[in-house]
């Protein structure tokens, strides 16, 4: 269920701010979004998997915290990230 090494490397390369950047909020939110989307597909087939659902809720909360941080720090980067990931309205 987790992202493969290749998928993770592709996401990091796409959202990094500079070479070697793996910890910026953009990269972290993009990785969490990919994991969340993958888990949503899992729940379509396994709707009673409550243990994994708790992990999904934790990921959603972590993503929300990172987005709140980025929104307070730099609204232009926040808006660009939301648009690229297709989150929100």
From Swiss-Prot:
Alphabetical list of InterPro entries matching this protein: Ribosomal_uS15, Ribosomal_uS15_bac-type, uS15_NS1_RNA-bd_sf
SMART domains tied to this protein: Ribosomal_S15
Keyword terms: Ribonucleoprotein, Ribosomal protein, RNA-binding, rRNA-binding
An annotated Gene Ontology molecular function: rRNA binding
GO biological process terms on file: translation
GO CC annotations on file: cytosolic small ribosomal subunit
One Pfam family from the record: Ribosomal_S15
SUPFAM superfamilies to which the protein is assigned, alphabetical: S15/NS1 RNA-binding domain
Cited CDD domains: Ribosomal_S15p_S13e
Subunit description: Part of the 30S ribosomal subunit. Forms a bridge to the 50S subunit in the 70S ribosome, contacting the 23S rRNA.
Function: One of the primary rRNA binding proteins, it binds directly to 16S rRNA where it helps nucleate assembly of the platform of the 30S subunit by binding and bridging several RNA helices of the 16S rRNA.
Family label: Belongs to the universal ribosomal protein uS15 family.
Protein name: Small ribosomal subunit protein uS15
Provenance organism: Pseudomonas putida (strain ATCC 47054 / DSM 6125 / CFBP 8728 / NCIMB 11950 / KT2440)
Gene for this chain: rpsO
């Amino acid at each position: 269920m987790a992202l493969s090494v290749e998928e993770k490397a592709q996401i990091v390369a796409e959202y990094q701010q500079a070479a070697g950047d793996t910890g910026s909020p953009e990269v972290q939110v993009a990785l969490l979004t990919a994991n969340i989307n993958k888990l949503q597909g899992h729940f379509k087939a396994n709707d009673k998997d409550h243990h994994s659902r708790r992990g999904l809720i934790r990921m959603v909360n972590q993503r929300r915290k990172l987005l709140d941080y980025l929104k307070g720090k730099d609204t232009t980067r926040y808006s660009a990230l939301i648009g690229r990931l297709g989150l929100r309205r």
